[in-house]
Amino acid sequence: MKTKMITREGYNKLKQELDYLWKEHRPEITQKVSWAASLGDRSENADYTYNKRLLRQIDRRVRFLSKFLPEVKIVDYAPQQEGKVFFGAWVEIENEAGEVMKFRIVGPEEIYGDAKGYISIDSPMARALLKKEVDDEVQVPTPSGIKEWFINSIEYDKGE
């Protein structure tokens, strides 16, 4: 089984999400389900149906997070990473057309909701960038062929 990795920032966000879902959101929705059920006929009760579905979604996410968080390996910055691309790096790349992209390489579970500026460690781009340095040229396989990118900068969040 592949080790599941996550940045400390990602772990903290998922932990906050679990706490919110379990301590605040789920009790609120449970109360709405109880209220809607008390109105009588559930077969045509839109409030009951909607909130019951929402409760199932919350429970599914809580089960996933409760199982995932204890199994995950938090990857913190290490001084040996400096100057090379590894898990957790913020990387700025540029192609010959002058297009610039900046993103952070993270675990796939960290990319959810409206998260922008993150790519999965499992993506072809991240795999091509790993262990490369600033000014290295990287060839990335894409459905339309090989694309070339140059690494402009590599940064790490060193705090926490």
Swiss-Prot record:
User: Which InterPro entries does its entry note?
Assistant: GreA/GreB_C_sf, TF_GreA/GreB_CS, Tscrpt_elong_fac_GreA/B, Tscrpt_elong_fac_GreA/B_C, Tscrpt_elong_fac_GreA/B_fam, Tscrpt_elong_fac_GreA/B_N, Tscrpt_elong_fac_GreA/B_N_sf, Tscrpt_elong_fac_GreB
Write down the NCBIfam families for this protein, in alphabetical order: greB, PRK01885.1
Keywords on this record?
A: DNA-binding, Transcription, Transcription regulation
Gene Ontology MF term list: DNA binding; RNA polymerase binding
TM helices/strands, residue ranges: none
Q: What is this protein called?
A: Transcription elongation factor GreB
The GO biological-process annotations, alphabetized, read as: DNA-templated transcription elongation; regulation of DNA-templated transcription elongation
Signal peptide feature range = none
For the keyword Transport, the answer is: no
Keyword Cell division listed? The answer is no
Q: SUPFAM superfamilies annotated for this entry? A: FKBP-like, GreA transcript cleavage protein, N-terminal domain
Q: What does this protein do?
A: Necessary for efficient RNA polymerase transcription elongation past template-encoded arresting sites. The arresting sites in DNA have the property of trapping a certain fraction of elongating RNA polymerases that pass through, resulting in locked ternary complexes. Cleavage of the nascent transcript by cleavage factors such as GreA or GreB allows the resumption of elongation from the new 3'terminus. GreB releases sequences of up to 9 nucleotides in length.
* Family affiliation: Belongs to the GreA/GreB family. GreB subfamily.
